[in-house]
């Protein structure tokens, strides 16, 4: 498993990958910080579960609240990226080649996922820092007070928000990887993933409010938002953890039992 992690990190730490990731992360962080601050409501109460107000952003955790609000809208993107990363390994025959050197399939799968999540964790940390810095510069233009951002409470909130977003990414990653391992076809896996996490869950939610308490994508959105009117963050966390456990078991069993012929 260690060898698999190292091998995957070699691919991820190539100069081209690092440059593209750094530029994309910086652009995303600055742009979304500006969008969140501009869209902040002047009222004392949020107009939606994922909205922010000038008052809420002026609290100690306001700086990283900008970050969590921004990334909460990128769930489908994260889901699709992990589907593609795993499904392409089948279409390119990479898994078949890797199994010649690491025949223990579950360790191979776990090693690849661990490396990707470790890389994602580093990218998230950088994104949070850049978003916070950009928000600190832009906040005065929207009458957002930033004095309490630089405090122990602000630091504690930053760590808490980082942990929440990391779990959010891990949830999408595991669900996306499981779908890719079961389906294997890149076009089909992407079609299912985009349709489900994109319009399907939200269309069903419009007709059936209880869907927010059961669908994984909606639960992940609720968790990273700190809870919604339909489901608390704690319930979302527990339910998503259950889904992730089941998805991981299905993916591991499927990968271990089925032939890798491509």
What are these regions (language model features)?
Residues 11, 87, 98-100, 176, ...:
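Helix-capping/transition residues at the boundaries of transmembrane alpha-helices
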Residues 17, 104-106, 110, 185-188:
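Membrane-helix interface segments
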Residues 18, 22-83, 109-181, 199-202, ...:
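Secretory targeting signals
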Residues 22, 96, 109, 190-191:
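Hydrophobic/aromatic positions within or immediately flanking transmembrane alpha-helices
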Residues 82-101, 105-106:
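Transmembrane helix boundary and interhelical loop/hinge segments in multi-pass membrane proteins
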């Amino acid at each position: 498993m260690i060898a698999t992690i190292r091998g995957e990190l070699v691919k991820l730490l190539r100069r081209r990958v690092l440059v593209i990731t750094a530029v994309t992360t910086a652009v995303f962080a600055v742009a979304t910080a500006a969008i969140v601050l501009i869209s902040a409501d002047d009222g004392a109460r949020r107009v939606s579960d994922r909205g922010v107000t000038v008052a809420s952003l002026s609290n100690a955790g306001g700086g990283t609240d900008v970050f969590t609000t921004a990334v909460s809208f990128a769930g489908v993107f994260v889901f699709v990226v992990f589907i593609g990363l795993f499904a392409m390994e089948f279409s390119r025959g990479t898994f078949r080649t890797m199994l010649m050197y690491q025949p223990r399939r579950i360790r191979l799968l776990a090693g690849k996922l661990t490396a990707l999540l470790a890389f994602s964790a580093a990218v998230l940390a950088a994104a949070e820092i850049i978003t916070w810095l950009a928000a600190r510069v832009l906040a005065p233009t929207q009458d957002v007070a930033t004095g309490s951002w630089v405090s122990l409470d602000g630091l504690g909130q930053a760590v808490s928000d980082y942990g929440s977003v990391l779990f959010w990414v891990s949830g999408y990653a595991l669900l996306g990887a499981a779908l890719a391992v079961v389906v294997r076809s890149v076009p089909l896996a992407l079609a299912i993933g985009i349709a489900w996490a994109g319009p399907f869950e939200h269309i069903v939610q419009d007709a059936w409010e209880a869907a927010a308490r059961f669908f994984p994508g909606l639960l992940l959105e609720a968790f990273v938002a700190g809870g919604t009117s339909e489901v608390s963050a704690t319930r979302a966390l527990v339910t998503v953890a259950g889904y992730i456990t089941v998805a991981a078991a299905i993916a591991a069993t499927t990968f271990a039992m089925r032939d890798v012929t491509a």
